[in-house]
Structure formats: C-alpha cells, structure tokens
A protein has these predicted regions:
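Class I SAM-dependent methyltransferase Rossmann-like catalytic core
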Residues: 52-91
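N-terminal auxiliary segments of SAM/dcSAM-dependent transferases
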Residues: 1-51
Length: 188
C-alpha cells in the first residue's frame, strides 16, 4: 500500500496548523521526516551523504543535511503555506493549462510541494524538479516512483539550476528556491 495517504494526512495537518502551533508543527514535520526517510532509505550517518558538493556556482549541501531541512518546522510551515497560497493565486488567473511550478534544489523529498499533491490534481499543477546532488537526486526519483507521483511531473532532472535552461516553449508560473541561512550563502 502506498504511503501517500499518510503523507497527505501529515502535510494537511501542517497546512491547517496555525503558524504559532509550534508543538503541533514539530510533531507533524518529524512524522513526515520519518516517513520520507523510510521511503528513500537514506542512511544519515553514511559519510558520503554528509559531503558538500563543490560546483562552479557554489556549494550544494550533502544529502543528509538536505533531508534534515524538513525538521526546521517553522521554516517548513512558512514555505509550504507560501507555495500553497501562490498556487491558489495562479489557479485563479491561468486557464486552459496547469500551473507549472519549477522547484530548484528539491532535496531528496521535494517536501515543500508534497502538500500540493493532496489538494490539487495533475491537471491543475505540474512540476519541474531540479536537483544537482546525485545521491539526493536518486532519492528524489525513488520517492517520486514509490509515491507514484509521475503524473504530476512535467520534468525531473539532475541539474545545476544556475546553469539549467528552460526550454523556450515551456512556461514557469511559480519558481521555488529555498533560500538558506547565512552559513549556506555559497549554495547555488
């Protein structure tokens, strides 16, 4: 049985929680983290998963650190709320096609867009997912396959978003880039 209904239940709790419900958000984000770790099989202790990848454009954090970002429950809540609201706003103005959402630097879970799959169908939203770290990309692909989210995926690529070129005939309505704290200022 697919874990997607459980993920939808957890992400709905995150979206429905008040912004100041720290305890509730902490519990929900940790539940989501554990489910996604189980799906992807990430070994958080493996040395290779902790390695920062150096690129021409900066640094890409290791798989372990990317996976752990979801545990910052206030940050996760703010991003999920903002993306959900932006999607609702775009759905009011775009007709005849889905809203196209480009998510650059998805991490292993693309966690910030998972709530959208609980609230919208594939005719309403389509994702372009970009991830530069190979181990992280492989986990992302495993998660998409396990949850059977392919119908939502317009494009999924292992790519450096700072160098990636959007084909001229493809629209992007919402662009997601997780701006990280000062310690990650060199992350692309």
């Amino acid at each position: 049985m697919s874990p997607l209904p459980l993920i939808h239940s957890i992400t709905n709790r995150i979206l429905n929680a008040p912004k100041n419900a720290a305890g509730e958000l902490f519990v929900a984000c940790n539940e989501l983290y554990k489910v996604l770790l189980q799906i992807t099989g990430i070994d958080l202790e493996e040395a290779a998963n902790r390695q920062t990848q150096t690129l021409e454009s900066g640094h890409a954090i290791g798989l372990t650190w990317a996976a752990m970002c979801i545990q910052d429950y206030m940050r996760t809540k703010r991003f999920m709320d903002g993306i959900y609201q932006a999607t609702n706003d775009k759905l009011k103005t775009i007709t005849g096609r889905p809203v196209h959402i480009l998510y650059a630097g998805t991490g292993p879970f693309a966690a910030l867009i998972l709530p959208l799959t609980a609230r919208f169908n594939e005719k309403q939203i389509q994702f372009i997912l970009l991830e530069v770290n190979e181990q992280t990309f492989n986990c992302l692909q495993k998660m998409v396959d396990t949850l059977q989210l392919q119908k939502y995926i317009h494009r999924i690529e292992k790519a450096d978003a700072t160098k990636w070129k959007l084909p001229s005939n493809e629209p992007v309505d919402i662009f997601i880039s997780e701006t990280m704290q000062q310690a990650l200022v060199k992350e692309p």
